[in-house]
Amino acid sequence: MQNKLKLIAIVPKISLLKNRLDQVLASLFKKHSRTILKRHILSKDVCVNGRILDQPDAKVLYKDIISINLKFKAKNDYQAENIFLNVIYEDDDILVINKQDNFVVHPGAGNTSGTLLNALLHRDSTFFNIPRAGIVHRLDKDTTGLMVIAKNNLSYMALIDQIKCKKVIREYQAIVYGKVISGGTIVKSIIRNPIKRTTMIVNKCGKRAITHYRILKRFTHHTHLKIILETGRTHQIRTHMLYINFPLVGDKTYGNKFKFYKNISLTLLEQVKKFPRQALHASRLCLYHPVTKHLMEWNSTLPRDMLNLIALLNKNI
């Protein structure tokens, strides 16, 4: 079963540096690849001022109104499942949750059920009619914290656009191995590891990624950080922190080879080793409401496991 989503945009002057239809579409709808957009043109899914244009090299003008009828697969292949969601805000257009750990966001290889998507489909059947069931960004399975979900197609496209334009503030708290001397910014491209495809690595051939980090508190052998994402690449924080030799506590994928300090107490060593997940929490989310345009902000306190870890580290300063 296929559903439809209509995208509409007005051609600005800046897009007319190259006024071919396919080039203008690529500049207006950057989330979609040139190949996909060209396919929509040839399939007669694109209208300019209400008239179908099916030639990629057709010329468009300033203030022309372009619309695309996108088709996407409905989520009927996925099962609605009654899974608890910690909802901290909801209206007709958006849903904000505080995601728990050990919770996959979207079905994939090895995770076809028990995900956030399955939970959303159970909560409201209208999510079947929204791309990705309204999920506009992700958190890793064992990362906790704030996520926003779109409840209709208008909100979905508006939130995607805000993320693309870097208008959404996503702030995290993390506990890392090592004593970080000062805050900083990491600007390093990230690419999928060609040897181990489930992981990411820093590589100049990858996608540009920017991570800002600030010190909240230093401990003897660890540091509590505030981290702000400017981009949102897969495993970005975990990959970047490993790159600068301050991997996340509990990260079995990106921190398991980190050497513990020799003078650390045995009690602390055992507790840190037993921490069950990467110590990472999405603590602050700030965005413009997709309909009212009001600036909205949500904050989430650290989960119990991270609070307990900080308390333990405080005792060993």
UniProtKB/Swiss-Prot annotation:
One of its GO terms (biological process) is enzyme-directed rRNA pseudouridine synthesis. The keyword Hydrolase does not apply. Keywords: Cytoplasm, Isomerase, RNA-binding, rRNA processing. It is found in: Cytoplasm. Its EC number is 5.4.99.23. GO terms for molecular function: 23S rRNA pseudouridine(1911/1915/1917) synthase activity; RNA binding. InterPro entries: PsdUridine_synth_cat_dom_sf, PsdUridine_synth_RluA-like_CS, PsdUridine_synth_RluC/D, PsdUridine_synth_RsuA/RluA, RluA_PseudoU_synthase, S4_RNA-bd, S4_RNA-bd_sf. One of its GO terms (cellular component) is cytoplasm. Residues 19-83 form the S4 RNA-binding domain. The keyword RNA-binding applies. The active site is at 140. Coiled coil: none annotated. Its main location: cytoplasm. It catalyses: uridine(1911/1915/1917) in 23S rRNA = pseudouridine(1911/1915/1917) in 23S rRNA. Pfam families: PseudoU_synth_2 (PF00849). SUPFAM superfamilies: Alpha-L RNA-binding motif, Pseudouridine synthase. Belongs to the pseudouridine synthase RluA family. Responsible for synthesis of pseudouridine from uracil at positions 1911, 1915 and 1917 in 23S ribosomal RNA. PANTHER family: MITOCHONDRIAL RNA PSEUDOURIDINE SYNTHASE, RIBOSOMAL LARGE SUBUNIT PSEUDOURIDINE SYNTHASE D. This is Ribosomal large subunit pseudouridine synthase D. The gene is rluD.
